[in-house]
Amino acid sequence: MDKRMTYRELIQTLLSRYVEEDVTDEAVEVQLLCDTQRDHYQWMNVGWKGMKRVYSCFIHIDIKDGKIWLQQNWTEEDPAAALVEMGVLREDIVLGLQPPYKRPYMDYRVA
């Protein structure tokens, strides 16, 4: 199996685990969006909490040029570290949510 296919499976496994642990109320739908053709993966919550609209993307991960890009993380989880524990090389992870000038000081790939 090539690296891209492996990364797709690992990302989906990780996000599925996070989604299963989400304890949002019944009026809010927890969604796992997996576009395996374009390699975009998101954990979303959509719905209503009383009179307030809930529309949140908690984690957004892309695969670009053979690298995993963590685009957003509004959780207390560390998906980059979890992916490393699952076998992804640190140099194959880009913290896209960090500005480019900060990335050289991170333990992951710059871009």
What are these language model-derived features?
Residues M1-A111:
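Terminal domain-initiation and capping elements
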